[in-house]
Amino acid sequence: MNMKKIFKRTSLLLATALIGVTATVQAQKSPQDMDRFIDALMRRMTVEEKIGQLNLPVTGEITTGQAKSSDVAKKIEQGLVGGLFNLKGVAKIRDVQKLAVENSRLGIPLLFGMDVIHGYETIFPIPLGLSCTWDMAAIGQSARIAATEASADGISWTFSPMVDISRDPRWGRVSEGSGEDPFLGGAIARAMVLGYQGKDPDDQLKRNDEIMACVKHFALYGAGEAGRDYNTVDMSRNRMFNEYMYPYEAAVRAGVGSAMASFNEVDGVPATANHWLMTDVLRKQWGFNGFVVTDFTGISEMVEHGIGNLQTVSTRALNAGVDMDMVSEGFVGTLKKSLTEGKITMKTLDAACRRILEAKYKLGLFDDPYKYCDLSRPARDIFTREHRAAARRIAAESFVLLKNEPFEGQGKKSSRPVLPLEKQGTVAVIGPLGNTRSNMPGTWSVAARLDDYPSLYEGLKEMTASRVNITYAKGSNLISDAAYEERATLFGRSLNRDNRTDKKLLDEALKVASGADVIVAALGESSEMSGESSSLSLIHISEPTRQAEISY
């Protein structure tokens, strides 16, 4: 028997032994059983495999056929990947999970994460809109439905809730959080964690429609100076804990399974390398027992902070209390060298590896690596009639009516408030967001069916049938600058630029509006005009748009 066959046989025996352990341990579910299982597993792991559990590369739309020849696939087979994110489709995820379970030496299953922020394929209002409901049951239901759909498509981990308090409207990610109030933010954080993971904090993640939540971005991400994304945060501890920290703590108290480090500095130290934040506050003060993941390239971006090279920043992050490296691959590329040089200890490495393995254990992946890979579930559990009805109801609950008075002007006077509209006459939809499908779901709706959402114009026509004459005019392009507009058409969103002159667009809108009894103005931002790494210096409708002319 040659050495290759001996290795294969040994690997098979090891995998069989592990499967035998998992089949019994998942039935008992005690902390002691989990500790014994992970102790036994870690004794079998090499240093490289332990470091591999801390590695979270991005996949894109990889398939098994493509993956087998890819660098990511090779690393999976070598045990150098702990999880993947941005892989959509349960069949694809099942195939990649099979690669990890059957082709790696120890068969350790992968985590599969995605930004499931305000729905999966059934989309709910953006988080800022959800906060306007002040209805924790509704917000929890939105997370419960999102977890049901995401888990049906193979996802076991969501990078949500985003609970950053924001008080500067120029910041590009205001829409992802609940606004400026820490009490409301804390209540929403709890509701969403329980919605994703299960209602009972002591009995979560048991079902295959419950997924692990990730509170983010720890900490103070929404407090960057001048509303600039990734910027420095410098404030007193009194203000920090009274105005910004409570929502993170509320998520921890609800049992959140993971936390994401933020990009910004706190007290001059990047959060991703901030021991006081990640260890002293998060773990020691609040008792967090999950794992910490960086944001996208959060480790490698610290090189730009001037801390040092990739090895130095990777060492700083691990020693601070970060457990998983998203995309940078600083951990998998440098930690073994740092261990040899004494810059990290085996105790620190083992602690980080253990926390990742504990998350997989709590999710039940050692008992059934394909727990989230039931190929029959998507047709049954995604974009259902019941889910869409809930989304519609919660969206209506989120609306904020600022003013509803009788109309008076242009020689006309009404004795009743404008709303509700009567189903008669002519209604003109005016504005660049009036007839766009892809921008209806809002920002961070990465799994949305962009072509399945009717535009405002289409929806009104369908709802009123032939009883109301619904007309439309664009009035202006969403953004005057074509180059800027191209930047704002991310993630499959389309703005459908109209190349007519500004005057012709405005004249058309005036003509359409003059023939209407009611005008519905659809103005504002596209889904991606601001967001991660983007902020606005002007927060009103003006340049770089021509929309102000329509509103006047």
Residue map of PLM features:
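Hydrophobic alpha-helical segments, chiefly the membrane-spanning helices
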Residues: 550-552
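Glycoside hydrolase catalytic-domain context in secreted enzymes
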Residues: 23-542, 546
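Bacterial Sec-dependent N-terminal signal peptides
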Residues: 1-29
